[in-house]
UniProtKB/Swiss-Prot annotation:
Pfam entry (one): DUF4711
CC annotations in GO: membrane
Location in the cell: Membrane
Disordered, as annotated region: 152-182, 239-278
This protein's name: Uncharacterized protein C17orf78 homolog
UniProt entry tagged with the keyword Aminoacyl-tRNA synthetase: no
Biased composition (Polar residues): 247-257
Keyword Transmembrane helix applies: yes
Chief place of localization: membrane
Length: 286
């Protein structure tokens, strides 16, 4: 029994969620129609936009750039954002997430941000948030990693100037081919595997302790076990007298059968006496 439990624990220890989604990430970059083709560096253009916006009297510091919706299998969701240089009194805000800026190695490459959740995000959960970044007017979200068969969510947002210096956002439809059913199935498998592992471990632990204590060290059973033993002994003692009572009964039955035979033989023994008496009577008449 213990060997079966050990092997079952080894089998269940195998990761049942092997088909879990790979670490996915999303990247936000400006659309190609936003900047002219002759611009060599997008960063320079963003700096120009930032300087132009700084000169305006009505400048909105917190600007909604995109609604980020990414599927991540790990506790960290990586999102690369193209944004302008940081300014004073302007915060990069992402609801329920925190932004960690990473310096760029190449001067021509745009700066990026790693969006890590403030609280740990479990595998398969949909991470949503709004990024408020200055200097970016149009963005799109597309996957950086992933195979050709796997498709990831993509959304485009455009910011257009409105009345009184206000800016509005337009968010396209969010397509998520990765169904949430797969995520729920993975979570259920994880939960059941944990439950099975715990049950097997508990049974192994209890059985191992019982074997080592009562079999190897020969520790006497507690009071309950002694009571059970006494009951078993009483039942055995009750059964023995019954067997002894049955044996004398058979002997008496045999003795009862023997007198019947004697009684049957008695009439035969009395018959000669009668014959003798008859003969004596016949002799007196002569």
């Amino acid at each position: 029994m213990d060997t079966i439990l050990v092997f079952s624990l080894i089998i269940t220890s195998y990761n049942v969620t092997k088909k879990e989604l790979r670490d996915s990430s999303c990247q936000v970059e400006p659309l190609p129609d936003l900047f002219p083709k002759d611009v060599r560096s997008i960063r320079a253009e963003l700096i120009r936009e930032a300087q132009a916006e700084a000169k305006r009297p009505m400048f909105i510091q917190n600007q909604t750039v995109a609604i980020l919706q990414c599927l991540g299998s790990g506790s960290k969701v990586k999102v690369n954002l193209v944004h302008s240089e940081k300014r004073q009194k302007v915060k990069h805000i992402l609801k329920n997430l925190r932004v960690m800026t990473v310096p760029c190695r190449n001067s021509t490459a745009p700066p990026s941000c790693h969006l890590t959740p403030a609280s740990k995000v479990q595998a398969g959960f949909l991470v949503t948030g709004k990024a408020f970044l200055p200097g970016v007017s149009q963005c799109k979200v597309y996957p950086v990693m992933g195979a050709s068969s796997e498709t990831y969510p993509s959304t485009t947002t455009s910011v257009t100037p409105g009345k009184k210096g206000e800016k509005t956002t337009k968010v396209d439809g969010f397509s998520s081919p990765l169904n949430q059913d797969t995520d729920e199935n993975l979570e259920k498998r994880k939960k059941w595997s944990i439950v099975v592992k715990v049950l097997i471990a508990v049974t192994l632990f209890v059985s191992g302790i019982a074997i080592t204590v009562f079999v190897i060290f020969e520790v006497p059973c507690p009071s309950r076990c002694q009571q059970v033993r006494e009951l078993c002994q009483c039942q055995r003692l009750r059964r023995r007298p019954r067997k002894e009572d049955q044996q004398p009964g058979t002997a008496e039955s045999q003795s009862d059968t023997q007198p019947k035979k004697v009684g049957q033989e008695a009439p035969n023994s009395s018959s000669p006496k009668k014959a003798v008496e008859i003969t004596v009577v016949h002799q007196t008449y002569f």
